[in-house]
Amino acid sequence: GLMEDTIIFYYGDHGGVLPRSKGYTYESGLQIPLVVYVPEKWKHLIPFDRGSRSQTFVEFIDLAPTALALAGVNVPTGMDGTPVMGKIVQKSEIQNKNTAFGYADRFDEKYDLVRTLRVGKYKYTRNYQPFNIDALFNFYRYKMLAYKEWLSLYREGKLNDVQSQFFEPKSPEALYNIDQDPHEINDLSNSENHQEILLRMRGQLHERIKEMPDLSFYPEPYLLDNAIVNPTTFGQNNKTAIAELIAIADLNLAPYDLVEGKIKLALQDKNPWKRYWGLIVCSSFGMQAKGLVPQIQKILQTDEVNLVRIRAVEFLMLNKISFDKNILKILLENTSSETEANLILNTISLIKGYQPEIKFNFSKEIFPGEWHDEPNDLVNRRLEYLMN
């Protein structure tokens, strides 16, 4: 009789296995099936008819409060998500729930920083580091023949513009009509007819990540050192500081000449993470920021924070501006943790993705052995790629 007394949730944790699905914020990676089995005796807890299909948007964060509501337990104040089933849930309250938040940070050794907001048929995507190409090497993905063939065809110049998007810089923001464009290849962010929708969804996403607040505007090594014990308290204590970092990150949404002065101030700030984000914004603008090269070169030479200096390297190498490459070796030698090493190696791997012919003059011995003594260590995966 256990089957008649059990509500079962059946769902996946990500989209499909083909390239550009799992590990990306496209709908092919985010949208998954959710099937709920409800026995006859518990159907009164479900706001929908058994055997029916609902278009209600359900996020992962909704599952915990839903389980509590089904069990008749009050959902704690402050818990993320909204119950979509339970005695307290009315169909009229959730049948029009059509908003979903998505994100991408690190997948194994591959870093990016992407946030998405889906509202009905429209989806807004915010690429905070748009120079991070989707094709950035990731060990397990490139074991798949489809990834390998796609990369080979790109390098041979055999892809059309749509097929090539995967290997090229993204725009800082994008807007898609999912009903008409389910594969998210037709960006509407520059369409005059969609500016009202774009600005509204941009604002909604901005307010959401500020209110959370979104901890990922600090680099992961810093979070592990300062926030891992109690990330909620850390976030609330640093809410204003995070909002200031988000404001700097958002400078790449404006024309460069209107924000150059603010970028300069960020690069000069005493807060290293403001300098960090100022450099990321420079890389987003590319050679439009060439007037800041002397300031960026000074940061590379004199900044006390390794992760700030590597962002200076990133700008210079993305724009093929010469500097002493021995600095790379110094930065790697000065890494204080495996996580910091992996983040630095992500930048170096990105450069190799853009410039496959480039060679680097360091070896695995630059790091402690325990960082790369197992084949699946993230640092080892990056080093295997860079050394091969």
Report each predicted region and the residues it spans.
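Long, internal low-complexity/basic segments
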Residues: 31, 157-172, 188-388
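A generic secondary-structure signal for well-formed alpha-helical elements
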Residues: 1, 39-42, 70-75, 88-92, ...
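Short glycine/proline-rich turn/loop motifs
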Residues: 42-49, 179-185, 255-261
